[in-house]
């Protein structure tokens, strides 16, 4: 391989990573206490990116790949091990502000130190040949397993938050954090890929460098975009966590009620909900299950249990279904209304969100339905 191709690849990636890393560390955020967790997450990401930039710098300025391939591979694996932890911690912190603890931090740092020591032993003490190569692949396998373990933990936190949003919010707040799921799967593919691509022959190693460019650009843009919605998401998350804690406190009463074939509160609840539906109370934007429980003068936990038992769906899906049916009636009665008007009157966040949900529910777009009504 011509060293220039490899060098040009590093010239493309290194400045971008330095810019992203320092931006994540130093760029300001709104001066509100609620953004402290976002800033912490972004700074963790900045440290991870700068650590990878330092790795790239060693490759660029020292040309270690051409001097000692095994040393370059083991250095990469050790760097990735620490970065896996940093990336997963940065993302998980957005979902659980209490995720990073002293004990957890100490454990993962010790694991990284152990991994690095073993890498040094493999490089310096084991003879070159089949044994050294086998142990290097074993270390790479350990890295992949470690990454998958962190990924599983992150996805569990993500799905827990989505479930809380669906059970407590009528609006699709989860759409604002969907990028976390997308980025996680991309990170798994990229992380495992990097662990394998570092073993590529010299003539193809530039692929390892260039593959990182779109990955970090996407991460950078996601964090910039998420800043716009972070306060709304964090408030919803805090409300949802509080509601979940209330659920735990009310578990005994709920279990006692659910032992009956028809819980004692269902008949009264059904009457109250019917009156609320007849009054079109579900079209109010930003509706939460707590607000509905206050309107119905009932317990939030009982209301949530009633919705799940009676309709076999989450609070958000139930409200969405009611809003879609309301939108259908508007389309039939007032075909001259625009899609944007119908979306707003039905309580949806945006016309695009309304169109997507309408198509999922009705099997056609509201525009087609509107044309048919006309």
Feature-to-residue mapping (PLM):
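Alpha-helical transmembrane segments and their immediate juxtamembrane interface regions
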Residues: 86-107, 213-239
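Alpha-helical transmembrane segments and their membrane-interface junctions
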Residues: 57-71, 188-206
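The DNA-contacting recognition helix of HTH DNA-binding domains
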Residues: 300, 350-352
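N-terminal low-complexity or simple alpha-helical regulatory segments
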Residues: 1-117, 131-134, 138
């Amino acid at each position: 391989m011509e060293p220039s191709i490899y060098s040009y690849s590093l010239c493309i990636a290194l400045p971008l990573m330095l810019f992203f890393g320092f931006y994540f560390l130093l760029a300001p955020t709104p001066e509100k206490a609620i953004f402290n967790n976002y800033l912490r997450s972004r700074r963790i990401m900045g440290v991870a990116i700068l650590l990878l930039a330092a790795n790239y710098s060693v490759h660029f300025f020292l040309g270690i790949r051409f001097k000692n391939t095994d040393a370059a591979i083991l250095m990469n694996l050790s760097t990735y091990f620490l970065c896996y932890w940093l990336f997963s911690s940065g993302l998980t912190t957005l979902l659980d502000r209490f995720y990073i603890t002293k004990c957890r931090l100490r454990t993962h740092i010790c694991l990284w130190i152990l991994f690095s020591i073993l890498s040094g032993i493999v490089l310096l003490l084991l003879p070159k040949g089949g044994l050294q190569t086998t142990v290097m692949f074993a270390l790479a396998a350990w890295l992949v397993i470690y990454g998958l373990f962190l990924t599983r933990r992150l996805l569990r936190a993500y799905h827990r938050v989505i479930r809380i949003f669906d059970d407590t919010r009528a609006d699709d707040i989860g759409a604002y954090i969907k990028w976390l799921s997308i980025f996680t799967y991309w990170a798994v593919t990229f992380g495992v890929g990097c662990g394998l691509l570092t073993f590529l022959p010299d003539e193809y190693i530039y692929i390892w460098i260039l593959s990182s460019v779109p990955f970090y650009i996407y991460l950078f843009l996601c964090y910039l975009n998420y800043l716009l919605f972070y306060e709304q998401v964090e408030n919803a998350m805090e409300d949802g966590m509080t509601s979940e804690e209330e659920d735990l406190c009310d578990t005994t009463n709920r279990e006692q009620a659910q032992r009956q074939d028809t819980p004692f509160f269902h008949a009264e609840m059904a009457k109250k909900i019917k009156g609320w539906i007849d009054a079109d109370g579900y079209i109010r934007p930003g509706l939460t299950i707590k607000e509905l429980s206050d309107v119905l003068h009932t317990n939030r936990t009982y209301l949530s249990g009633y919705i799940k038992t009676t309709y076999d769906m989450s609070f958000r899906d139930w409200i969405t279904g009611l809003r879609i049916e309301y939108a259908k009636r508007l389309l039939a009665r007032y075909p001259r209304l625009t899609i944007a008007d119908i979306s707003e009157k039905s309580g949806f966040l945006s016309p695009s969100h309304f169109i997507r949900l309408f198509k999922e529910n009705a099997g056609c777009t509201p525009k087609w339905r509107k044309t048919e009504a006309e």
